[in-house]
Amino acid sequence: MSTVKHLLQWLILGSKGGETRTKILTTLKEKPMNANNLSKKISMDYKTITHHLKILEQNQLINSVGNKYGQIYVISTQLEDEYDLFKKMIGGND
């Protein structure tokens, strides 16, 4: 089983914050953005978003460019390569 699959099972399917992290990843797949714009886009508290962004970045599912408030987040190449697997895991058909 691939490392990405293990990470996704743990971070998306096997943890309390999986639904929030799924929303973050699918939104970032559409368009890279900063935490503030992301919190507005998915209607969630900024601190909640930054908490989940930190977890996703620590696990190399997203990357960031810049620093502090203007820091832009994008899905990682690692996740991009396995995005079809991610969609299957969350029940998507795209």
Regions found by a protein language model. Give the residues of each.
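Short alpha-helical segments that sit at the start of domains
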Residues: 1-23
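Conserved segment of winged-helix/HTH DNA-binding domains
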Residues: 3, 8-9, 72-94
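Short capping segments at the starts of secondary-structure elements
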Residues: 17-19, 30-34
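A short acidic, leucine-rich amphipathic alpha-helix
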Residues: 37-41
